[in-house]
């Protein structure tokens, strides 16, 4: 079974957690090691269109995923980001939360991560994507934490 993420079909091999209403997947072009996404299962374009139970599940799942990626990738902090609508930088028309484990000094300016996320979401060159094998291996390593 594949997962819908906006205009994309996501292979189960890159999904490391599925809850009743959400799923988490590795990123094909991470801004930092461990940069993952958490999405509602239902393809909803804007945050205000989520039902209350979907909001609760999305953020409970995001919290669980954040704890795992911070530990697995030896982070000391987390950045959570959501672009809600085109003027906010949303390029995939499906609500999603970026979860990024952080370390001291990972960016010259701490807030540069937001500039990198903006560039990340606009640059869509398959040549810069990770291989399916690399993504599947990372998803498998993260999946262990949720079994």
Swiss-Prot record:
Homodimer. Interacts with UBE2I. Interacts with MDM2. Interacts with CTNNB1. Identified in a complex with CTNNB1 and LEF1. One of its GO terms (biological process) is intrinsic apoptotic signaling pathway by p53 class mediator. Changing residue 25 to W: Reduces affinity for substrates and impairs apoptosis. Strongly reduces affinity for substrates and impairs apoptosis. Keywords: Apoptosis, Chromosomal rearrangement, Cytoplasm, Hydrolase, Manganese, Mitochondrion, Nucleotide-binding, Nucleus, Phosphoprotein, Transcription, Transcription regulation, Transferase, Tumor suppressor. The active site is at residue 96. It is found in: Cytoplasm; Mitochondrion; Nucleus. It comes from Homo sapiens (Human). It holds the Pfam family HIT. GO terms for molecular function: adenosine 5'-monophosphoramidase activity; adenylylsulfatase activity; adenylylsulfate-ammonia adenylyltransferase activity; bis(5'-adenosyl)-triphosphatase activity; identical protein binding; nucleotide binding; ubiquitin protein ligase binding. This is Bis(5'-adenosyl)-triphosphatase. It catalyses: P(1),P(3)-bis(5'-adenosyl) triphosphate + H2O = AMP + ADP + 2 H(+); adenosine 5'-phosphosulfate + H2O = sulfate + AMP + 2 H(+); adenosine 5'-phosphosulfate + NH4(+) = adenosine 5'-phosphoramidate + sulfate + 2 H(+); adenosine 5'-phosphoramidate + H2O = AMP + NH4(+). The keyword Metal-binding does not apply. Its EC number is 3.6.1.29, 3.9.1.-, 3.6.2.1, 2.7.7.51. Possesses dinucleoside triphosphate hydrolase activity. Cleaves P(1)-P(3)-bis(5'-adenosyl) triphosphate (Ap3A) to yield AMP and ADP. Can also hydrolyze P(1)-P(4)-bis(5'-adenosyl) tetraphosphate (Ap4A), but has extremely low activity with ATP. Exhibits adenylylsulfatase activity, hydrolyzing adenosine 5'-phosphosulfate to yield AMP and sulfate. Exhibits adenosine 5'-monophosphoramidase activity, hydrolyzing purine nucleotide phosphoramidates with a single phosphate group such as adenosine 5'monophosphoramidate (AMP-NH2) to yield AMP and NH2. The modification Phosphotyrosine is found at residues 114, 145. The keyword Glycoprotein does not apply. GO terms for cellular component: cytoplasm; cytosol; fibrillar center; mitochondrion; nucleus; plasma membrane. Changing residue 114 to A: Impairs induction of apoptosis. Strongly reduced affinity for substrates.
């Amino acid at each position: 079974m594949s997962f819908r993420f906006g205009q994309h079909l996501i292979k189960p091999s890159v999904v490391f957690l599925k809850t009743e209403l959400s799923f988490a997947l590795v990123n094909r072009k991470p801004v930092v090691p461990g940069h993952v996404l958490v999405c509602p299962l239902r393809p909803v374009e804007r945050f205000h269109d989520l039902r209350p139970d979907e909001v609760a599940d999305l953020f409970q799942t995001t919290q669980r995923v954040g704890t795992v990626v911070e530990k697995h990738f030896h982070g000391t902090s987390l950045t959570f980001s959501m672009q809600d609508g085109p003027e906010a930088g949303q390029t995939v028309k499906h609500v999603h939360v970026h979860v990024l484990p952080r370390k001291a000094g990972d960016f010259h300016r701490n807030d540069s991560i937001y500039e990198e996320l903006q560039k990340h979401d606009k640059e869509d060159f398959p040549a810069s994507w990770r291989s399916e094998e690399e993504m599947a291996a990372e998803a498998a390593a993260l999946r262990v934490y949720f079994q």
